[in-house]
């Protein structure tokens, strides 16, 4: 599917990734800044479809790959339909640029993979019955900048074809904590996986490390490690 995107037309991408409640979601978002809190479910690279008809900055956040060739290829794919891209360790720059210019923006964040050690914004949550570490940037960016948060419920129709619906997790104004926003994200992703387990990318080795090991290493390098909750709020 990703290889097909090298030559796929915008019309074909919209045919393969049909967003059923786009008009309703656009009405809710209006001119607000917002976060697309995605997961490795279905063909997540197809989220580039959003940039076709929405011409404000849609910033896809990524982790640079170890292979320079693959990294260039994936950046090309993500930019083809108008998406901007920003490495996780340099995300603050484009965010502040858009905030200063008062230009609307969307951030595409995928938080269901293991955070890297260079990312201090980590949070433990119970996920699929196990203590699991998540990148906590969804909650922190949402609260710091008053950004709405949506996730995407994806269903496979046939090979390489999906339909999806945006689900609002946070309206940008509700008086809840960063952690509660993350709880909603984790719960939504788990529900989607339990409903359609075959669509999730299980190869990310989510439970390679245990909380005790992370805490020990975090202490050794002087980072503050979040505690593992007994259960999500």
Predicted features by range, described:
Residues 15-22, 41, 67, 88-89, ...:
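A conditional alpha-helix N-cap/helix-loop micro-motif detector
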Residues 30-89, 116-126:
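Catalytic core of membrane glycerolipid acyltransferases/transacylases, capturing the structured
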Residues 24, 43-46, 94:
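Well-ordered alpha-helical segments embedded in enzymatic catalytic cores
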Residues 1-38, 71-76, 82-83, 228:
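Membrane-anchoring hydrophobic helices of lipid-metabolizing enzymes
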Residues 14, 38-40, 58-61, 102-105, ...:
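Short acidic/polar alpha-helix capping motifs at helix-coil junctions
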Residues 9-17, 63, 82-88, 127-129, ...:
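Short, flexible loop segments at the rims of nucleotide/cofactor-binding pockets, characterized by
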Residues 26-30, 53, 80, 92-233:
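Non-catalytic C-terminal accessory region of glycerolipid acyltransferases
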Residues 20-22, 61-63, 88, 167-169, ...:
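Conserved beta-strand termini and adjacent loop/short-helix elements that scaffold enzyme active sites
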């Amino acid at each position: 599917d990703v290889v097909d995107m090298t030559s796929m037309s915008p019309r074909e991408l919209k045919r393969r990734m049909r967003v059923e409640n786009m008009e309703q979601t656009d009405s809710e978002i209006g001119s607000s800044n917002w976060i697309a809190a995605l997961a490795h479910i279905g063909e997540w690279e197809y989220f580039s479809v959003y940039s076709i008809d929405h011409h404000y900055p849609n910033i896809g956040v990524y982790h640079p790959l170890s292979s320079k060739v693959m990294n260039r290829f994936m950046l090309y794919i993500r930019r083809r339909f108008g998406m901007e891209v920003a490495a996780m360790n340099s995300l603050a720059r484009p965010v502040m640029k858009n905030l200063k210019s008062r230009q609307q923006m969307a951030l595409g964040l995928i938080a269901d993979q293991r955070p890297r050690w260079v990312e201090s914004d980590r949070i433990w949550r119970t996920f699929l019955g196990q203590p699991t570490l998540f990148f906590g940037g969804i909650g922190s960016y949402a609260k710091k900048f008053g950004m709405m948060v949506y996730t995407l419920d994806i269903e496979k129709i046939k090979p390489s074809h999906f339909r999806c619906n945006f689900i609002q997790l946070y309206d940008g104004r509700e008086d809840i904590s960063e952690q509660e926003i993350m709880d909603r994200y984790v719960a939504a992703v788990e529900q989607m996986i339990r409903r359609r387990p075959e669509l999730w990318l299980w190869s990310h080795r989510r439970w390679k490390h245990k909380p005790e090991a992370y805490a020990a290493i975090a202490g050794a390098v002087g980072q503050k490690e979040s505690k593992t909750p007994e259960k999500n709020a």
